[in-house]
Amino acid sequence: MKILLGISGSSSVHLGLKLLENLEKKAKVFCIITEGAKLSFEAENKKKLDKICKKRFKKVVFFEDNDLKAAVSSGSFGIKKTIIAPCSISTLAKIHAGISDTLLTRACAVALKEQKKLILGVREMPLSFLSLEQMTKLSSQGVCIAPPIYASYSGVKDLEDLENFIVGKWLNLLKIKHNLFKKWD
């Protein structure tokens, strides 16, 4: 199964990387990382994201966000599920407005027109009325809005447990089995 992971410019890029680490084991993964995500990651970690990705993810196919001719820009390429995690408010707004000026937003437009699974891990707080309205409209079109919110019922003990819960919930939405947190009995 072909899955596209987009990581867009906001804090918590490391959650996208943790998701990528888990996806790489279970599916054919294609990844687009926006310039904003790279800048956020480098500001938070003092490391270059491109170098880390090339070393860590050998099976993942990476595309530049400005490469509008890339295979994932076409519905005929066969991406079955798309997730953006984290998803910036800017990316959310572009998807809502149908603006396809980057590879990531084009790939989301394809997911919408092809009626494929599209999940947005919107990472912002507080949320404006406009962003809430955009999420509501996208949800009414079948888009799954799945912000990175944790729950304490899963036996959370530390930050890694919180991150595992969030990534595990995203994997659940993608119908990918995992052992990142204890399921509710």
Give residue ranges: language-model regions.
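A cross-family phosphate/adenosyl-ligand binding-site feature
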Residues: M1-I119, E124-D185
